A protein has these predicted regions:
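A mid-sequence, solvent-exposed acidic-amphipathic segment
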Residues: 159-192, 197
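Generic structural signal for beta-strand residues in well-ordered domains
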Residues: 40-41, 70, 176, 197, ...
């Protein structure tokens, strides 16, 4: 089974491609996490977990969900992580997570995809994003070939910098930067509720027709990037930046 969590569609796209290539079922963790559903999941022997990279590890909401949820029948697990640049030493923590679940760790693969973290970085324009997705294709094909063969992924880079970012920086980043306080709706907001619908942690609700954010945010960027009117800002940091979500690339041409 292919499990995935996504913020703005990159991981959903990769998970869909992997599930199709392996003829395996696809399981949406966003829906489970949003519903608070931790009922056992009948996965079968092999599990592929596809996620974005948050602070140089898999998203904390995903590791927490996995800690509460039994993967019935699972024996082996592969991790596929997409990122804008690097995953640090995420593999080391994925190995620990696999051990906690009593699963054979089959490795972690990194796939570079378009950046979406506009709370800190710039997202690409559509044509640049399409180029990045096309450049990711050989890596995706290699991942698929290894999965079909039941092979372990090759070990990713692991140096002192990677260990520092995934180790010391990760908890500091969550504590001081992963907050919803800076999100706000502009006058362009039409109160459609798309942000409420997409938030995997139910952290957004409408008040007097406008979104209001709570304290339980994972910085997935779904609310700000999927807003149809681009009516959400993250303080001053997001102003003037392109909003990125994968589905916008699919509207005009096939990927």
């Amino acid at each position: 089974m292919v499990l995935y969590f996504t913020g703005t569609g990159n991981s959903r796209y990769l998970a869909r491609r992997i599930a199709e290539g392996l003829e395996m079922p696809l399981y949406d963790l966003n829906a489970c996490i949003k519903a608070g559903d931790t009922a056992p999941v009948q996965t079968g022997r092999d599990v592929v977990l596809v996620t974005p990279t948050y602070a140089w590890r898999i998203p904390r909401v995903v590791s927490e969900w996995l800690g509460k949820t039994a993967l019935t029948g699972a024996e082996r697990i592969w991790f596929v992580m997409d990122c804008g640049s690097e995953i640090g030493n995420a593999a080391g923590y994925n190995r620990q997570l696999a051990a906690q679940k009593h699963l054979r760790y089959m490795g972690t693969a990194q796939i570079i995809m378009p950046e979406n973290y506009i709370a800190m970085f710039n997202a690409p324009q559509k044509e640049q994003a399409r180029s990045i997705v096309k450049q990711a294709e050989p890596t995706l094909q290699k991942v698929l070939a290894q999965l079909r063969a039941g092979q372990e992924f090759s070990p990713p880079r692991d140096n002192l910098y990677d260990r520092f970012m995934s180790g010391s920086v990760n908890p500091v980043f969550y504590r001081f930067f992963v907050k919803a306080d800076a999100f706000r709706a502009t006058d362009a907001c039409i109160g459609c509720g798309r942000c409420v619908e997409l938030c995997p942690l139910n952290n957004v609700h409408l008040k007097n027709g406008k979104p209001v954010w709570g304290k339980n945010c994972t910085h997935c960027m779904a609310c700000i990037c999927y807003c149809p009117k681009e009516a959400i800002e993250y303080g001053e940091k997001s102003k003037g930046k392109p909003r990125y979500h994968f589905e916008a690339l699919e509207k005009q041409q096939d990927i």
